[in-house]
A protein has these predicted regions:
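Amphipathic alpha-helical effector-binding/dimerization core
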Residues: 25-122
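Short, highly charged C-terminal tails/helix-capping segments
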Residues: 212-231
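Short amphipathic alpha-helical signal-transduction/dimerization elements
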Residues: 108, 112, 201-208, 212
Length: 231
């Protein structure tokens, strides 16, 4: 196949969501390919992460979800629910607004602010009264996440739930997903969040090792460039 034919094919696949073009001009699998693959077999990432997520849920007693980013939405690709009577319910395949959930904020924080701004709609839909009302509020939250190393979101997607999340990197040390633990907001006490975060970090390290991460101690959050970084 000629180079021009390959380029035309990749362009078509990119437009239809089956592949996604990276900043370095390489391509990675797109969300539509994942959706097609889910009909026949679970996504490789979800299969690998599943056992570790089960261990995590057994330790923290709240549910865990692995999500990927599709534009400005997150898509849940693996889920282990808590056995507690009062728990956060979700479904594999569910989509959420990325700026409203901890998984989404974790992944957005690994991007340059300029790229995030290109994705955000104007105005921002607000599922709850606690959701971000402006792009500036989103950027402030992303800066906070980069500083502390994790994402904590309270009542921004559902008015009675909280979530804490970390990005998950792949073999090229790029962020490929995010893992969160969600809980009813009344259970999100400082002590419980600290304990959950410690277990979450351990689980992400295990999953990243399986994914082939070669720089486990490197930060997933980039140094910000351009005009916004200087403001």
């Amino acid at each position: 196949m000629s180079k021009s034919s390959v380029h035309t094919l990749l362009t078509t696949l990119d437009q239809r969501g089956y592949v996604r073009r990276l900043d370095d001009q390489r391509y990675t699998i797109g969300i539509r390919a994942w959706q097609v693959g889910c009909v026949a077999t679970p996504l490789w990432m979800s299969r690998v992460a599943g056992p570790y997520m089960t261990e995590l849920v057994n330790k923290v007693a709240d549910g865990a979800a692995l999500a990927v980013l599709d534009g400005v939405e997150t898509v849940c690709i693996q889920l282990v629910e808590s056995t507690q009577v009062v728990r956060v319910h979700d479904n594999i395949g569910n989509r959420c607004l990325a700026w409203c959930v901890s998984n989404g904020i974790s992944m957005l924080a690994t991007m340059q602010d300029e790229e995030v701004l290109r994705l955000l709609p104007d105005p921002l839909p607000r599922p709850t009264e606690f959701s971000f009302a402006s792009e500036a509020e989103v950027l402030d939250k992303l800066a906070e996440v980069r500083a502390v190393g994790h994402s904590l979101m309270r009542r921004t997607w559902r008015p009675d739930t909280s979530g804490i999340s970390l990005p998950v990197r792949g073999a090229d040390n790029r962020t490929v997903a995010a893992l969160c633990v969600s809980m009813p907001d009344y259970r999100a006490t400082p002590d419980r969040l600290d304990e959950t975060l410690a277990e979450l970090r351990h689980t992400v390290r295990q999953i990243e090792r399986e994914f082939g991460v070669t720089e486990p101690d490197a930060s997933p959050f980039p140094i910000q460039k351009g005009v916004l970084a200087a403001q």
